[in-house]
Amino acid sequence: MAKSYYTFLNINENHIDKSMKKIGNVISCEKVNLFKKQNNLSYKESFIYNNLTYLLWYNLKEKKIFKNFEKLSDVGYLSYGDPYIDINDKKVTLDKINSLLDYENINNFTDFSDKKTILEIGAGSGRTTEAILTFNDELKYTICDIPPALFISYKRLSNVFKEKSIGLLYNLNEQELNSQINNYDISFIMPHQLNFIKNKKFDLSIAIDCIHEMRKRDIAKLFNNISTISNYFYFSVWKE
């Protein structure tokens, strides 16, 4: 599961050069099991994963968002036997690090403090969603995705946020969706249902590294929909 959604095992030079330059000649005094063999990964994959995680950990430590690392729950971030390394007795994953980096980038784009409603396109495993809701408990959150990701993130968030009301609304028609979408803390819908949303304006919409997987005509439809139903739109693209 982890290899499909959020574990990066193929590294190119341009993926790590800036991160290594930022660290420079740091001498580590941390307690870390850097040569751990990960379950479901080969020794080569484990070596790459462990070192990349440690590299990004050092970069994360220089950022303000680092102080929130321990707020992230292992219930979600280690829910599928995800690979991790122990650093100073903390379970550290690429998933946690990337979620914090994404959170900081979004918050720098437009502050979460004045947001009440969020729409996320292509939430995948739900890693970014979990971070955002962990730090902003009062948000109303809608996830728009396709199976199997839709159900993977649903299961994850249901396990992490047991006190929140969560609705699977993917099979509702236009009238039903508009009458029910405001009844839940977290709602799950399908892409075609974006056309159904009429009397709702999201404070912020986000799309993390998923737009490049869409067809050009679908990208045009997405941007048209977002311009109608959202005040802000943050997106990032992993590759051109």
Residue ranges, per PLM feature:
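Conserved class I S-adenosyl-L-methionine
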Residues: D114-G124
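A short, conserved alpha-helix within the catalytic core of class I
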Residues: E213-I226
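S-adenosyl-L-methionine
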Residues: L157-K198
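Conserved SAM-binding loop of SAM-dependent methyltransferases across substrates and taxa
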Residues: S125-N136
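Hydrophobic beta-strand segment of the Class I
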Residues: S205-I206
